[in-house]
C-alpha cells in the first residue's frame, strides 16, 4: 500500500524541504505536470476517462500506452457515468445501464489487454441528471464483477451519494465489491455554492471517515488497496486556488503514517 497526494507547487516545496513525505505523486494526464512531478517522486496518472457517455472508442490508446511506459501508473482508471435518459428506479433501465458500462469497459480491455482496469464511483449531484443511476452500488458491483474490473473507491463520493439518498455509508459500501478494491481516494467535504463538495482539506468528520476506512482495510473487510490518495490540492483552475501549504503540512504526515509504504526510497532521475 502506497500513499499518494495530488501534485501541486506547494506540495513540491514541502517535499523539497523535507517537511512532508509521500510514496507517489498523483498527476493528471498532462505532460508538463508529469515532467515536473517525476523529478520529485514516482508519478502515477489519474485519467479523465468516462465510461457510459459513448466516447470510449474515440480514446487515443497509443497515448495511453505511452503514459504507462513513462510513469509508475499501475492501472488504467475510468469513471462510471450514468445515462441521464434512464430511470434509476426501473429494473429494465438499470439493466440497460449495466449493459452500456459493460460494453465500454470491454472495449477498453480489448484495446489494452495487459493493463489492469479500475472503475471509480462518482457522487450524486443535482448538476448531473444521470448521477443517481450512476452511483447505484448494486449496478457498480454487477458491472465490475461481470467485466473483472477492480474498484477505485472514492470515499468522499460515496459520502456525498449517501447524503443525497439518505443512506447509511456502511450500507452503501456493503453493496460494493470491496474485496476488489485497488485504489482509495480521500478528501475533505465542505458546503460550497450551496452543495456538499469534495477536494477540500479534512475536517473532524472527514478524519473520522478516513479512520474508519483504515480500520476496514486492517480488519480485512476491504482488500488492501495498492494506492491510497489524498485528492487535496493540485494545479489548474479547479484545484490550484484551494491548495494551502498549512493544510498539506497538517494532513500529509498523518495520512502517510496511516496509509504509506514506510520502506519507500527514491532517487530523482537527474
Residue ranges of each PLM-predicted region?
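Gly/Pro-rich active-site loop or hairpin
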Residues: 52-58, 89-98, 161-225, 233, ...
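A short secondary-structure junction signal
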Residues: 128-131, 155-156, 162-165, 196
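C-terminal helical cap(s) of enzyme catalytic domains, especially alpha/beta-barrels
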Residues: 239-269
Amino acid at each position: 500500500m502506497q500513499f499518494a497526494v495530488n501534485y501541486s507547487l506547494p506540495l513540491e516545496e514541502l517535499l523539497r524541504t523535507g517537511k512532508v513525505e509521500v510514496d507517489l505523486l498523483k498527476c493528471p494526464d498532462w505532460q508538463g505536470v508529469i515532467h515536473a512531478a517525476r523529478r520529485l517522486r514516482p508519478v502515477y496518472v489519474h485519467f479523465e476517462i468516462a465510461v457510459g457517455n459513448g466516447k470510449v472508442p474515440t480514446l487515443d490508446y497509443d497515448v495511453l500506452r505511452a503514459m504507462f511506459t513513462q510513469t509508475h501508473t499501475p492501472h488504467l482508471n475510468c469513471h462510471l457515468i450514468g445515462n441521464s435518459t434512464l430511470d434509476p428506479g426501473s429494473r429494465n433501465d438499470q439493466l440497460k445501464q449495466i449493459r452500456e458500462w459493460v460494453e465500454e469497459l470491454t472495449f477498453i480491455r480489448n484495446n489494452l489487454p495487459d493493463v489492469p482496469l479500475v472503475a471509480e464511483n462518482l457522487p450524486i449531484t443535482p448538476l448531473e441528471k444521470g448521477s443517481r443511476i450512476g452511483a447505484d452500488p448494486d449496478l457498480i458491483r454487477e458491472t465490475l464483477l461481470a467485466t473483472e474490473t477492480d474498484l477505485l473507491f472514492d470515499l468522499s463520493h460515496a459520502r456525498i451519494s449517501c447524503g443525497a439518498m439518505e443512506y447509511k455509508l456502511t450500507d452503501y459500501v456493503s453493496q460494493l465489491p470491496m474485496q476488489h478494491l485497488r485504489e482509495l481516494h480521500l478528501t475533505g467535504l465542505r458546503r460550497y455554492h450551496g452543495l456538499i463538495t469534495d477536494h477540500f482539506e479534512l475536517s473532524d468528520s472527514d478524519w473520522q471517515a478516513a479512520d474508519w476506512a483504515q480500520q476496514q482495510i486492517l480488519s480485512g473487510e476491504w482488500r488492501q488497496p495498492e494506492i491510497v490518495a489524498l485528492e487535496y490540492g493540485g494545479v489548474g483552475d479547479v484545484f490550484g486556488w484551494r491548495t494551502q501549504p498549512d493544510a498539506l503540512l497538517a494532513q500529509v504526515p498523518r495520512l502517510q503514517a496511516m496509509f504509506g509504504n514506510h520502506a519507500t526510497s527514491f532517487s530523482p532521475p537527474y
